[in-house]
Amino acid sequence: MRLVVCLVFLASFALVCQGQGCKGPYTRPILRPYVRPVVSYNACTLSCRGITTTQARSCCTRLGRCCHVAKGYSG
């Protein structure tokens, strides 16, 4: 009888944890290390308006495609 009660308790506890997520010291989300975003090569083929300053600098240094105000790419 004790075995049945114990098994029922464990089964119900497992269902509760599975449905809601147990809140304990070992179940918190794992923090990921900061990773620098990689500028894709496709960003350099877009107009200068659609990319960030970092992407524009990267395109200019890597490919020689430099953005100029109101002119788009040159080079």
UniProtKB/Swiss-Prot annotation:
Keywords in alphabetical order: Amidation, Antibiotic, Antimicrobial, Chitin-binding, Disulfide bond, Fungicide, Pyrrolidone carboxylic acid, Signal
One MF annotation (Gene Ontology) recorded for this entry: chitin binding
Subcellular location: Cytoplasmic granule
GO cellular component, one term: cytoplasm
Predominant location: cytoplasm
Signal peptide (residue range): 1-19
Name of the featured protein: Penaeidin-3m
Organism expressing this protein natively: Penaeus setiferus (Atlantic white shrimp)
